[in-house]
């Protein structure tokens, strides 16, 4: 049955632009957009339900394309210690940092991880998020990476959202592989990835290419394994130093390379040629008080598509609001509101390989959209907080919180 959503204005975000339709309407049929356009051009038809949006602005549902939403515990005490002058290295040496999250995640049951993640993600839903990517990477062995990926699949079953799972086993070196990074990478490639993929738990494969994680050569080993399994790849790259990770990602036609503060112009050109999306993570940049900015002008100059994401994680970006990330993207990285909104809609969809079905409001695409109590789409980026979403629609059905 067809449902009519009328009396609204629409920012479709086609081609990464507002692409306004004023005095508009949307017709949904099942989970898809059947028709979209000016209300005066609405075809004569019979509708099972008519919804008056009362002049609201409508945007595509938000897509959070880089998160670590499943984890045990939190690191708020470490946050306070850092502000008291304790260095990250000192925290890590005392058993804190990512090691503490690995311990807490390993100790937690599937049910505990699921319940804590659902609380966080429901907050994001209320902010307009309808699609989310979630990474593993706090288990760091087969049993616990599997546990995390099973929880991610369960989130997709429990919530009316599109949920994509990414295996990030190559996130950090687990304690049982201390000083044996090559052996751990071999374990990922010969044991973990093939088994997890065979169980249908993996949509994409990610790795952390950095001096404190894994080298480009080690990451390439992971990428080759993913490629042999038919899985797309993504990469944490150039966050703290320039190792050429983003160029490596481009060579393997990665969906995205993420962080990118230290990427070079050659890296940018390589990503432009491969079509790899640049995912910027201003929440981590903000919390870590970084001073090295991603090369925004170069990315734009060379036509690299820019996405934004929360990077929700317990250590460096405990961000539960993608709208706050929008403002950070504009304020810190000087993206225009239009560029920022493209970064959490159509460009974020491209970073997940979903651009044919998600990310913009067009006939035939999935009916994920948000109605906003605003006078112009730039307000979504401008306001810090506030109850702006009037309705969140997922697969053609309004989400009731």
UniProtKB/Swiss-Prot annotation:
Please give the start and end residues of each transmembrane region. Answer: none
In what pathway does it function?
Answer: Amino-acid degradation; L-histidine degradation into L-glutamate; N-formimidoyl-L-glutamate from L-histidine: step 3/3
What processes does the entry annotate via GO biological process terms? L-histidine catabolic process to glutamate and formamide; L-histidine catabolic process to glutamate and formate
Signal peptide extent: none
State where the protein is found: Cytoplasm
**Which free-text remark accompanies the cofactor?**
Binds 1 zinc or iron ion per subunit.
What protein family does this chain belong to?
A: Belongs to the metallo-dependent hydrolases superfamily. HutI family.
For this entry, the protein name equals Imidazolonepropionase
Originating species: Acinetobacter baumannii (strain AB0057)
Q: Which gene encodes it?
A: hutI
């Amino acid at each position: 049955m067809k449902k009519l959503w009328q009396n609204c204005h629409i920012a479709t975000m086609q081609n990464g632009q507002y692409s306004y339709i004023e005095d508009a309407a949307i017709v949904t049929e099942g989970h898809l957009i059947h028709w979209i356009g000016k209300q005066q051009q609405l075809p004569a038809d019979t509708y099972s339900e008519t919804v008056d949006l009362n002049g609201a602005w409508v945007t595509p549902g938000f897509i959070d394309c880089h998160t670590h939403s499943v984890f045990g515990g939190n690191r708020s005490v470490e946050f306070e210690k850092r502000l008291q002058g304790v260095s990250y290295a000192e925290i890590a040496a005392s058993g804190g940092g990512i090691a503490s999250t690995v311990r807490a995640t390993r100790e937690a049951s599937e049910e505990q991880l699921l319940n804590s993640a659902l609380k966080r993600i429901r907050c994001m839903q209320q902010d307009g998020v309808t699609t989310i990517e979630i990474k593993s990477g706090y288990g760091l062995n087969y049993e616990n990476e599997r546990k995390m990926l099973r929880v991610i699949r369960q989130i997709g079953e429990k919530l009316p959202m599109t949920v994509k799972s990414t295996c990030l086993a190559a996130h950090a070196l687990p304690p049982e592989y201390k000083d044996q990074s090559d052996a751990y990478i071999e374990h990922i490639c010969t044991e973990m990835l093939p088994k997890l993929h065979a169980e249908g738990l993996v949509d994409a494969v990610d790795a952390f290419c950095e001096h404190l994680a894994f080298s480009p050569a080690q990451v390439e080993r992971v990428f080759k394994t993913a490629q042999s399994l038919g899985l797309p790849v993504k990469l944490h790259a150039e966050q703290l130093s320039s190792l050429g990770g983003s160029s490596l990602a481009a060579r393997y036609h990665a969906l995205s390379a993420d962080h990118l503060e230290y990427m070079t112009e050659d890296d940018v050109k390589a990503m432009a040629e491969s079509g790899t999306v640049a995912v910027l993570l201003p929440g981590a940049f903000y919390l870590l008080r970084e001073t090295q900015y991603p090369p925004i002008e170069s990315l734009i100059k060379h036509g690299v598509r820019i996405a934004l994401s929360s990077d929700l994680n317990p250590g460096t970006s405990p961000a539960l609001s993608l709208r706050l990330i929008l403002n950070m993207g504009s304020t810190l990285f000087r993206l225009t509101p239009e560029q920022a909104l493209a970064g959490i809609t159509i460009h974020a969809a491209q970073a997940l390989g979903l651009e044919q079905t998600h990310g913009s409001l067009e006939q035939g695409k999935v009916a994920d959209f948000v109605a906003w109590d605003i006078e112009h789409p730039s307000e979504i980026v401008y306001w810090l907080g506030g109850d702006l979403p009037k309705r969140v629609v997922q697969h053609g059905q309004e989400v009731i919180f």
